[in-house]
Amino acid sequence: MAGALRNAMVYLGLAEDDRYAEDTEPETTRPRVEAAREVRVESRHEARPEVRHEPRPEVSVERRPAPATTAQVTPIRKQVAHVVPQTSTTSSSPELHRITTIHPRTYNEAKTIGESFREGVPVIMNLTDMDDSDAKRLVDFSAGLVFGLHGAIERVTNKVFLLSPANVEVASQEEERPTERTFFNQS
């Protein structure tokens, strides 16, 4: 096993091959045990031609550093167009011309709700004709839609919701009666 490991190390270049180093030594300096071992191994070596490695002459390459030169640095400026803000002829909040009312029967009608709301049109969803599981899915979809487009969702009645875009403000009865909200708050 040690011989196989040694051969693997020699093959990978992790150790030197001692067989060739022994051949170059004078025979008088080797002990008799190694000579006896060579006699047994000699029959294996006779089939192979002997390879002698001659030392290579050392080649020295002289590298000289490049001569230092100084050069002018020219700054490069990128041409930027002059930007003039446009004045809008329309008002910043467009007038509300329509409200969409949708009575979905299946969850597949969520696309029409999303398209209308994305265009900035307030949507009233009447989910009374839907079963509870699909109605819940549609409310979850609408909540995500409202959150993504910075709008608001309000519950009008049981299973009826109002989706209002960010540019639409909804006035409710609570806002009209501020005294009733603060009447019980005596802190």
UniProtKB/Swiss-Prot annotation:
Pfam families linked to this entry: SepF
UniProt GO cellular component terms: cytoplasm
Domain of life, source organism: Bacteria
Localization per Swiss-Prot or TrEMBL: Cytoplasm
Positions of region (Disordered): 13-74
Record-linked InterPro entries: Cell_div_SepF, Cell_div_SepF/SepF-rel, SepF-like_sf
Summary of subunit composition and partner proteins: Homodimer. Interacts with FtsZ.
PANTHER family listed in its UniProt record: CELL DIVISION PROTEIN SEPF
Family note: Belongs to the SepF family.
Name under which the protein is recorded: Cell division protein SepF
Source organism of this protein record: Kineococcus radiotolerans (strain ATCC BAA-149 / DSM 14245 / SRS30216)
Encoding gene, per UniProt annotation: sepF
